[in-house]
Amino acid sequence: MATLTNVTFGGTAWIPQFVQSINQTKCIGCGRCFKACGRDVLALKALNDEGEWVEDEDDEEIERKVMTIANRDKCIGCEACSRVCPKNCYTHESLN
């Protein structure tokens, strides 16, 4: 399959890099990536001290929150999330 290549307004070739994964051990749940993404790709989810997902209503069980990929299909490959992440949690790949 061919690689998806776009051209910027200035004529430079650009290959979108789509979000593949978030390293949840490194994620500090700061929300910077969530604010940078205007496409509703990400969601902040809660974990308990055993590393299991918990509902936000169970406040007493929440150990910490981490970012997750909620809607991968909405990613446009801009990598804004990765650029603002202070812990470099993101892995991106081009379409092949």
UniProtKB/Swiss-Prot annotation:
The keyword Repeat applies. Binds 2 [4Fe-4S] clusters. One of its GO terms (molecular function) is 4 iron, 4 sulfur cluster binding. Homodimer. GO terms for biological process: nitrogen fixation. It holds the Pfam family Fer4_7. Transmembrane segments: none annotated. Ferredoxins are iron-sulfur proteins that transfer electrons in a wide variety of metabolic reactions. [4Fe-4S] cluster 2 binds at C75, C78, C81, C85. Keywords: 4Fe-4S, Electron transport, Iron, Iron-sulfur, Metal-binding, Nitrogen fixation, Repeat, Transport. Residues 18-47, 65-95 form the 4Fe-4S ferredoxin-type domain. [4Fe-4S] cluster 1 binds at C27, C30, C33, C37. The keyword Transmembrane does not apply. Its cofactor is [4Fe-4S] cluster. This is Ferredoxin-3.
